[in-house]
């Protein structure tokens, strides 16, 4: 009987991986928040971070993505604390953060607050002193001409050793380590680092086996259409770079619309939209550096167009600081001036079906795209639900004339809390870098 049940599950998952929905039902209207445990609190521990869970729940966060929680290698370490992405042991916890029981308590608290938690998974490489090397598995790695471990080619990652995906035993060990966190800590999925550098057939196999343990949510740090075979969500890197370009007058606002026009991803796949993340913040600058005075305008855009909105820890404090990557650099939580701003955006995404993810929601209908004035107006609607968004990316005050048969009735203003009756023709005023969001 057990064999028959296992075969049935395998066949169901095989069908799922060949065109049906992969994403768990709970993700349909989810939002996501990236957590850097080291920098989140002065203590830099799971226990200290846990005090923020109720606040994040209230802010409208559904998925917590934790940057790697594993021990960091000592060999060739960068800085005094090292990179999270140079992993020493896939089945252990970084002692900086606490122990496995501390992590399990955090996961339980997250679940008790009706949220989900995924962890960063670095499958492309390990630290050179990973336990696999200690165990004599040197053949699990890419070796140079002299038979030594080597970092991933084309990078400055001298603190890691590249893995060899031609080795089937290594693949099995990797999947088993991923299963470890499902069975021992009850996490809800993985954000997979440089996922496009790992063969897609590995990810398909991994997804199939993981889903047989627990239905997982999978996020790929990649923007390649083949990733949809195994992942529920990929990065919206192209959109992010267009937003930076518009802010810096290197791109036109029409490039934003064109991005969605040419999208060929399956309708049930999610893209992750963001104005910041750990890579952008530490290496390319804060959103204030990259986007200037329009950083909030782009946050509104990224939260309300098609895609799942990401908030990087500290953005709700107007974090205008590049967090150090290899050293302790605690976020200052005294100034929480954007908590209400992000709470409004995230909770609207969660509650209004027009904004839901993939084909649970709707595509944006751009009714005004003005390159000269740097303004955009779009509508998203699903059934009787509708969201209207007007954005001014320029430093000049604007009055925009709206004409659309799609608009009619009483609308709520997201930020002013006022109710407004509108019809197919009306005017809307926008301050420099201003925005208005109406919904029903």
What positions do the PLM features span?
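Bacterial Sec-dependent N-terminal signal peptides
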Residues: 1-21
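Carbohydrate-interacting/catalytic domains
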Residues: 19-65, 71, 104, 110, ...
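Substrate-binding/active-site clefts of carbohydrate-active enzymes
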Residues: 20-32, 36-47, 51-62, 68-185, ...
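Structural recognition of the beta-strand scaffold that forms the well-ordered cores
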Residues: 31-34, 63-68, 118-119, 189-191, ...
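Short, flexible loop/turn elements at secondary-structure junctions
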Residues: 37-41, 70, 94, 123, ...
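Active-site-proximal helices and loops of the catalytic beta/alpha 8
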Residues: 183, 193-274, 290, 301, ...
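Short, solvent-exposed helix-loop connector elements
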Residues: 283-289
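Hydrophobic targeting/anchoring helices
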Residues: 296-304
